[in-house]
Amino acid sequence: MKKIKVLMAAGALAGAMATQGAAFELGVVAFQMSAETQARCANTVGAEAEKLGWTTQVLNSNGALETHASQLDNLIQKGVDAMILCMSKPVQFDAQFLAAKDAGIPVITISSGASPHTLFDVTPNEYVMASEAAIYLLGTINFEGNVLLQKFESNTGARIRGEVMDVVLKENPQVKVLGEHSMARTKSWQDDVRNGMSALILQNAGNVNGIWSSFDGQALIIDDILLEAGMKKGDVSLVSIDGGQEVYRRIKDPGSMMTATVAIPFEDMAAKAVDMMKQIAVDGKAKADLVPGPYLFIPATLVDKTNVDQFLK
């Protein structure tokens, strides 16, 4: 009889733990999942959370500020247990972040920038990555010649990359910027990049030695434009930041202009965000004991023809 009671108690405890695990609800929002990196990030968060038995809801804002705000508002009103946001915008959505904090909902962001209302942002060191990409590009043209720049100001990380590039160029006056395009739209960003860079490439045909873009999605479009113009690998150096199988394939491809990228381990960052959320929101560990500041930095790696085979799957 005693053995039966022990077994019943153990079963009840296991059931309670299972119920508790299943009851933990995580809201996951990516700002624009048509960007490969954001899709990788959000989908990995969802998959890792499900491994823990959590209920997850993965949302795509499709690059629309209004949609992103509404999705955050709805998750807060619903009372989810926690949120992980991929490539969000802390400045634009400060009100939502504050509302989540006031509601006792812990928030971790990924490659979004810091906010006083979130636990922290999981990110590579943008300053290190940006300087590495900038110096690499200039090295491929022997620190002289003409370049075009494709920027993006609305994302914190992309903006930092552009600002670091500007500093590097200032210290290397023998490299001239023939033109730059700043991506303004997020919902139809592919068309924005294609239209802006097509015009710059046409205007400066035959005079461009290198092209820098703030993230790989832009670089892929630029590569297509260059290929359509009849250029061959080596005619122009094309360097960007993010990493992904399509970019690696093009770096390897002798017919592509893609020269190098700085590969961010988005899957590792997403998995780390889920693990940290579990330790803080479920296990009760103090954030300060795990992450002593507003950022949790994850290392990135420059990928070019010398090591691309290590990254291709």
Model-inferred region functions:
Residues 2-8, 13, 17-313:
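A residue-level marker of the well-folded mature domains of exported/periplasmic proteins
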